[in-house]
Structures are given as C-alpha cells and as structure tokens.
C-alpha cells in the first residue's frame, strides 16, 4: 500500500519517544522467555451502564507494535513500569496491521 512506509516510520518514532512509550517484557502464556517490546500504556477509568446504574472500573490498555509482539493472546503477561499486566480478550489491530491495542488487567 502506498504511503505505508511513511506510517510505519511515524509509528516507529512514536514508540521510540521516551515520553510516550516505555520498555516492556512480553511473556506468551505468562511464562519465560520474556521478549522485549516498547509499549504505550494507558490507564483510565471506564464507565459501563447497566440499566439505570453506572459502574466505573479501572482499565489498562496497551498499544504495541505488531513487529515486536506478533501474536498476543489472552493469558499473556506484559511487565512495564513496575506493573505486571495480564492480557484479556482478543487484541485489535489497526487498519495497517502495525499496532495492536490490547486490554489488560493487573496480575
């Protein structure tokens, strides 16, 4: 796809920026060997509605390059910034298949 290299280069720049991304360790199935990967961690509250009630829960969402974490799946672990996170659910890829968005929960 034309221009894909431009997007890949921009993604690489974002993940190289220490104010945006941090070093992480991915463990498939939660076991060694640990594979290094740069990750963008977002910690935010999520509001869920159930009837007339609203629930607020903490969430952890990682973004990681497909090139560094080719096959994330539920049960994998990611260690970053002193936190150990467990991947839950199926990861979502962006349109160009350059970045995974991965929902996690604390270990």
PLM region spans:
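Short, conserved turn/kink motifs that form compact alpha/beta structural patches or helix kinks used as
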Residues: 19-107
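Active-site-proximal polar cores
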Residues: 1-31
């Amino acid at each position: 796809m034309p221009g894909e290299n431009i997007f890949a280069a921009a993604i690489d720049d974002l993940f190289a920026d220490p104010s945006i991304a941090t070093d992480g360790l991915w463990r498939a199935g939660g076991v060694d060997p640990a594979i290094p990967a740069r990750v963008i961690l977002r910690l935010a509250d999520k509001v869920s509605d159930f009837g007339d009630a609203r629930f607020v829960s903490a969430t952890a969402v990682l973004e990681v390059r497909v090139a560094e974490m080719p096959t994330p799946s539920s049960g994998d672990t990611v260690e970053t910034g002193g936190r150990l996170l467990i991947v839950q659910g199926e990861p979502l890829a962006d349109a160009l298949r350059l970045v995974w968005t991965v929902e996690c929960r604390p270990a």
